[in-house]
Amino acid sequence: MFNVVLVEPEIPPNTGNVIRLCANTGARLHLIEPLGFPLDDAKMRRAGLDYHEYAQMRVHRDWDAFVAAEAPDPARMFAFTTRGSGRFHDRAFEPGDWFVFGAETRGLAPALVDRFAPEQRVRLPMRPGNRSLNLSNTVAVVVFEAWRQAGFEGGA
């Protein structure tokens, strides 16, 4: 299935929503520290309801530890950023792909975005003049589009 990577998430309910999304779609969740909250935060647990036990989640101390532990294929990693030049719906996603998202208030650090090839820097369309979409909403749109492309494999 797909991999969701949240780099330094800050808002507990967003991460809770993503946990629930991953449990319901079979996506694996990777959290890159530092986190803006403790993992037992009540707001995060409430947003994720009782789905925590069904989600596959790993926590990594930083980006380099994540890359060392998971060894993702750079060609199958996609950085979702408002500074991306490619549109997500023009991509052909494959099971096993890695979808990387930044912190709610600042997105992905420019130095991290620079590690991705330009064609791997992707954005969702928005109306002009808006800054960004909510993190958990963006993750849901991306995961469901990728899962749709995979024929909703494993879904009921």
From Swiss-Prot:
It is an enzyme of class 2 (transferase). Transmembrane segments: none annotated. InterPro entries: Alpha/beta_knot_MTases, SpoU_MeTrfase, TrmL, tRNA_m1G_MTases_N. GO terms for biological process: wobble position cytosine ribose methylation; wobble position uridine ribose methylation. Methylates the ribose at the nucleotide 34 wobble position in the two leucyl isoacceptors tRNA(Leu)(CmAA) and tRNA(Leu)(cmnm5UmAA). Catalyzes the methyl transfer from S-adenosyl-L-methionine to the 2'-OH of the wobble nucleotide. NCBIfam families: tRNA_yibK_trmL. Keywords: Cytoplasm, Methyltransferase, S-adenosyl-L-methionine, Transferase, tRNA processing. It is found in: Cytoplasm. It comes from Burkholderia pseudomallei (strain 1106a). It comes from the Bacteria. Homodimer. This is tRNA (cytidine(34)-2'-O)-methyltransferase. S-adenosyl-L-methionine binds at G102, L124, S132. CDD domains: SpoU-like_TrmL. GO terms for cellular component: cytoplasm. It catalyses: cytidine(34) in tRNA + S-adenosyl-L-methionine = 2'-O-methylcytidine(34) in tRNA + S-adenosyl-L-homocysteine + H(+); 5-carboxymethylaminomethyluridine(34) in tRNA(Leu) + S-adenosyl-L-methionine = 5-carboxymethylaminomethyl-2'-O-methyluridine(34) in tRNA(Leu) + S-adenosyl-L-homocysteine + H(+). Belongs to the class IV-like SAM-binding methyltransferase superfamily. RNA methyltransferase TrmH family. TrmL subfamily. It holds the Pfam family SpoU_methylase. The gene is trmL. Its EC number is 2.1.1.207. GO terms for molecular function: RNA binding; tRNA (5-carboxymethylaminomethyluridine(34)-2'-O)-methyltransferase activity; tRNA (cytidine(34)-2'-O)-methyltransferase activity. Its main location: cytoplasm.
